[in-house]
């Protein structure tokens, strides 16, 4: 997407902001539904802590790598769009799949299943979110306009994810 020197239309800001919903809603929902793992599946606090901690460690490592990849991509679709698309698909499929847990599989199996799929989910989130946020900053070359774009996107993402939960 080429940087614009003029004001970005409000409709563009709002539609861009809807993408922020995915970045806010899925991790928030993951935290809320984590209670199911503790109460219904008997995950102890150490397991619960590892499920929260380890995927975020992987996320912290992969975010800068994804930024480098996205910044240095040259394709007919641009630097960002294909990653946003692929990341959204990975996030959606993984989020649905990770909750397919059954008590009869056993505690250890369910723990590893959920942990591995949580890591895959956060990889999808990285593939989606890093180029997505960069795309928002590339929509305008003007500082205040970029600030407005991201403020609207954050507002939409935060409020709609709260309504969802």
Model segments located where?
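Membrane-embedded alpha-helical bundles of multi-pass transporters/translocases
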Residues: 2-163
């Amino acid at each position: 997407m080429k940087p614009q020197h003029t004001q970005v239309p409000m409709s563009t800001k709002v539609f861009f902001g809807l993408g922020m919903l995915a970045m806010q809603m899925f991790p928030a929902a993951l935290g809320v539904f984590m209670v199911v793992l503790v109460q219904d599946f008997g995950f102890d606090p150490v397991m619960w802590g590892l499920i929260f901690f380890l995927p975020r460690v992987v996320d912290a490592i992969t975010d800068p790598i994804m930024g480098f990849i996205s910044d240095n991509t040259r394709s007919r679709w641009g630097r960002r769009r294909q990653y946003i698309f692929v990341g959204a698909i990975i996030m959606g499929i993984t989020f649905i799949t990770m909750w397919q847990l059954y008590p009869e599989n056993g505690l250890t199996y369910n723990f590893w299943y959920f942990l591995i799929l949580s890591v895959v989910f956060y990889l999808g989130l990285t593939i989606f979110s890093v180029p997505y946020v960069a795309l928002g900053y590339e929509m305008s070359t003007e500082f205040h306009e970029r600030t407005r774009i991201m403020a609207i996107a954050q507002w939409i993402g935060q409020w709609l994810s709260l309504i969802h939960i």
